[in-house]
């Protein structure tokens, strides 16, 4: 097994999703606990997956910072809230969203959990093309709000 290589990133092509959830944030915390699943490969030349910027959402939650895992590098990477939002809006199948159920309690601090809800509501107000996926997630994660 090899750790995947760090790709070239930019504000419009950045690390996000489960990959970002498995890279320690500035506090050294990780949200998900499966780095081998999302950051390793049998192929020594494989790169970490990147995401293309969704223009409706913009660059909220994407920062240029130095990461120390799997290698030290300066990259554009989503914070945990944005990583979850990207999983929702880039999902091709409902199972990908269902795999996030419980994430606000498992992955996020109270502050991040509130930020996730507020960001998703803002995206809905903009009429995002994946609004149905966002509603599906919100109905499960925030049933009383």
Report the location of each language-model feature.
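Short gly/ser-rich loop at a beta-strand->alpha-helix junction or flexible surface loop bordering the NTP-binding
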Residues: 1-66
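Hydrophobic alpha-helical interaction segments
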Residues: 63-145
